[in-house]
A protein has these predicted regions:
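Membrane-helix boundary connector in multi-pass membrane proteins
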Residues: 101-119
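Hydrophobic alpha-helical membrane segments
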Residues: 68, 86-105, 123-127
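Core segments of alpha-helical transmembrane spans in multipass integral membrane proteins
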Residues: 18, 49-76, 92-96
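Juxtamembrane helix-break-helix junctions at the cytosolic face
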Residues: 69-86, 108-109
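Membrane-water interface at the C-terminal end of transmembrane alpha helices
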Residues: 125-136
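Juxtamembrane helix-capping/reentrant segments at transmembrane boundaries
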Residues: 43-47, 80-91
Length: 136
């Protein structure tokens, strides 16, 4: 198993993203998942009708994208022989993690946030770095 394989990185990212989508889905129904839910990471979080709809939206968005990363992109990347396209996919993967990483860091630095908010930060920066060192 090549740990610098872009297809493996995308697959692992899709699996982790699916887990986060599940956490947000639970959050939409006011079920707090230990360590990862908004309520667990931000004790001052108050569920409202709007926040539940926003969590549902996030769950569907992340879940949809994770399905592509699990069921399509790994096999597509393994069959892809065009080096320029592979490099472009790698660049996009790394690039879209940068604003996400900054946003997650900002959220973890908010007053009242618990230590476990840094789990999401570590995951986000980890995938950014792993994607950056991937072989394209």
């Amino acid at each position: 198993m090549n740990f610098r394989s872009l297809s493996l990185i995308v697959l692992c990212h899709g699996i982790v993203a699916a887990a986060f989508a599940f956490v947000f889905l639970l959050e939409a129904f006011e079920i707090a998942f230990p360590l990862l839910s908004l309520e667990a990471q931000h004790p001052n979080f108050v569920a409202t009708e709007y926040s539940k709809v926003a969590c549902l939206f996030v769950a569907v968005a992340i879940g949809t994208f994770s399905a592509y990363e699990i069921f399509f992109f790994p096999s597509y990347l393994n069959k892809l022989s065009d080096e320029a396209t592979r490099k472009k996919i790698k660049m996009i993967f790394v690039s879209y993690h940068i604003p996400w990483s900054l946003m997650i860091t900002y959220i973890a630095l908010l007053d009242g946030t618990t230590w476990n908010a840094w789990i999401s930060v570590a995951v986000m920066y980890g995938f950014t770095l792993w994607g950056a060192i991937a072989k394209s």
